[in-house]
Regions:
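Short, amphipathic alpha-helical segments that act as regulatory/interfacial helices
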Residues: 36-39, 61-64, 68-71, 75-83, ...
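Phosphate-backbone recognition surface of nucleic-acid-processing proteins
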Residues: 154-157, 163-246
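Short alpha-helix plus adjacent loop in nuclease-associated cores
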Residues: 3, 9-58, 96-99, 104, ...
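Glycine-rich, often acidic, oxyanion-interacting loops/wings at catalytic, nucleic-acid
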Residues: 62-154
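Residue-level detector of well-ordered alpha-helical segments, enriched
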Residues: 70, 74-77, 165, 181, ...
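Short helix-capping/linker segments at secondary-structure and domain boundaries
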Residues: 43-45, 74-78, 136, 174-178, ...
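Low-complexity, acidic/Ser/Thr- and charged residue-rich accessory regions of DNA metabolism proteins
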Residues: 200-201, 236-276
Length: 276
């Protein structure tokens, strides 16, 4: 409202306005005075202001990510349910290449289960079909965003990124110029380790997880398909996994993918795999 009436509006980042967070006595009047002093000294840490279109795209894509995550959890639940059944049931299920295809679901619904067990499985598959419908509804929107975004098209050339993840990353980053280098992008995604330093000792802890969790989710989600598709990325991951363990290697791979995203976006080009 303020910007439309000719008044410059600044939105302060609540986690970074340390003067307010540390105050012993907090009242609206005191907070306003502190903000006024910070503004006068040009020390207000601002939140990035997204366009209306970007915020709308965020909501749709994040909702889709929620549905995808819920579907993954539901699939795991179905597999766990079937693993608890008697051997002849498990043998019938094992013959199906995809139990969630139309044919596979018919096989599951035809299993010789106890009445209560059958109802449980029917409820799980009904929920699966509902999630599948909701995800399908966003497909046209994802396609439209992809066709309109050169950045998403560059990102899609990177191993591990399909259309949806490419569009999600492009929308969450929005404007690459707000990141001065790859380290700032890593911090924004929350894939850097926490650091505790005292004297001459420095301890690196778990990742901070304080950044954009959707961007972090997309980068981590792309790790496994990326290392399967790209030889050099696989070598990078396996070398780290041997020395630091699988979890740390996975986070390092997510950082590597974000670095590649930064470079192809900034240079306006497709990803080029190293040729031996």
């Amino acid at each position: 409202m303020g910007s439309s009436s000719g008044v410059a509006v600044k939105i302060a980042h609540p986690n970074e306005v340390k003067a307010i967070a540390r105050a012993k006595i907090k009242t609206d009047k005191r907070d306003s005075e502190v903000l006024a002093h910070l503004l006068r000294m040009n020390m207000i840490p601002e939140v990035y202001r997204r366009s209306t279109e970007n915020r709308q795209a965020q909501r749709v894509l994040r909702q889709r990510a929620f549905y995808v995550s819920a579907m993954t959890a539901l699939k795991n639940r179905v597999h766990a349910f079937l693993a608890q059944q008697r051997e002849e049931i498990r043998e019938v299920v094992a013959r199906e290449t995809n139990i969630f295809s139309e044919k596979g679901q018919k096989v599951l619904l035809g299993l010789d289960l106890a009445p209560r067990e059958k109802k449980l499985l029917e409820a799980l598959l009904k929920t699966y079909r509902h999630l599948e419908t909701r995800i399908g509804e966003s497909k046209a929107f994802v396609e439209k965003l992809y066709e309109e975004s050169r950045e998403a098209q560059f990102i899609r050339t990177i191993p591990g990124f399909g259309k949806y993840l490419s569009v999600l990353v492009a929308v969450e980053i929005a404007d690459l110029t707000r990141f001065t280098d790859t380290a700032h992008l890593h911090a924004y995604a929350g894939v850097i380790p926490s650091i505790h330093s005292s004297g001459d000792r420095t301890h690196y802890g778990k990742i901070i997880k304080a950044g954009n969790r959707w961007l972090r989710w997309a980068a981590v989600e792309a790790v496994w398909p990326a290392i399967r598709a790209d030889f050099d990325l696989r070598c990078f991951y396996e070398r780290l996994a041997r020395g630091k363990g699988a979890n740390k290697a996975k986070v390092a791979m997510a950082r590597r993918l974000l670095t590649i995203i930064y470079k192809v976006w900034k240079e306006g080009r497709n990803y080029i795999a190293y040729r031996r």
